[in-house]
Amino acid sequence: MWLQHLSLKTFRNYKETKIDFNPKLNVFLGRNAQGKTNMLEAIYFLALTRSHRTRTDKNLIHFDEEQLHLSGLVQKKTGSIPLEIELTQKGRVTKVNHLKQARLSDYVGHMNVVLFAPEDLQLIKGAPSIRRKFIDMELGQIKPIYLSDLTNYNHILKQRNTYLKSAQKIDETFLSVLDDQLVDYGCRVMNHRLDFIKKLESFGRKKHFELSNQIEELSISYQSSVNITDKQNLSESFKIALEKSRSRDLFKKNTGVGPHRDDISFYINGMDASFGSQGQHRSLVLSIKLAEIELMESITTESPILLLDDVMSELDNTRQLKLLETISQSIQTFITTTSLDHLQNLPENLSIFTIQDGKASVNGN
């Protein structure tokens, strides 16, 4: 798949911009704070209805406006798909083929993206919430039912936590009903994640082995607050975990176990990767991103769109060549950079856009 056209209206520092893209390589060139990353963020937001930079949607709206509008035309094997997002102070409206979508799971997945940015190194050493978000964003694109199950789980979780905080006297029967619903959707979420991690590890192990000159083996482990060793009895294990955590939950007035507390760990040759070098972290994250591309292709039969936010200057020649090798394989790619000096051995079929003061102009092919 590839993004043929993008229209931005009052998004970040863009008042109104319309731009047609190259199906292969697109380079956003410009000084810092001109809007290069904002352009990538717009593409990411159009795909996922979420920003990778802020949790507050109103930050995306131009400072002197009250709403924003994004639209794009995605080309896929099955044909053209128009996508639209309108964001106001009241919320967002999403459209596919000009038809309003009632659920997030009905919208996400029509345009798949893989983002690689400097902050992705936090995937290794950052908080568990960063890794959970990583799973949610990637898995949600290739498996819409996951977003539906996750939304339902979070809804029940919020109900349970609200009840724990507000109830003067706990009704054990009502709490048990909430627990049953939490277990139902929680097990679905965990099963989706376990399957995803298994596949990601398979693709990632191969990529990392190649990238490390065949001396490092990558493995990924899903760390759960619930006993997940026996998937057949996962529901029973979750119930037992909730029962054991009941006293703790009543005291702290929140839910201490479940997929909202889970994490993933990365290992290199059996050792915790968080203790590795900066170079190992870069290689590991690059391996994961390249694995994401292959995983998405294997499930959707479409190549995702690759977004590279100022990462080429962070990579040595070996890693750059590996990334460029992937770019050359018919994957539409967007790169931000302050200088073309950082970009070596680029494919010939590319478009360069100069970004200045929230405006984009084509200056090379």
Swiss-Prot record:
Tagged with keyword Cytoplasm: yes
Main location, first listed in the record: cytoplasm
Chain residues that bind ATP: 30-37
Keyword field contains Cell membrane: no
CDD domains hit by this protein: ABC_RecF
Highest taxon of the lineage: Bacteria
Deleted gene: phenotype: Mutant is sensitive to the alkylating agent methyl methanesulfonate and the DNA cross-linking agent mitomycin C.
Transmembrane segments: none
GO biological process, one term: SOS response
PROSITE patterns: RECF_1 (PS00617), RECF_2 (PS00618)
Keyword terms, alphabetized: ATP-binding, Cytoplasm, DNA damage, DNA repair, DNA replication, DNA-binding, Nucleotide-binding, SOS response
Function in brief: The RecF protein is involved in DNA metabolism; it is required for DNA replication and normal SOS inducibility. RecF binds preferentially to single-stranded, linear DNA. It also seems to bind ATP. Plays no role in chromosomal or plasmid transformation but is required for resolution of chromosome dimers occurring as intermediates in the formation of merodiploids by transformation.
Family: Belongs to the RecF family.
NCBIfam families the UniProt entry points to: recf (TIGR00611)
Name of the featured protein: DNA replication and repair protein RecF
Organism: Streptococcus pneumoniae (strain ATCC BAA-255 / R6)
Gene: recF
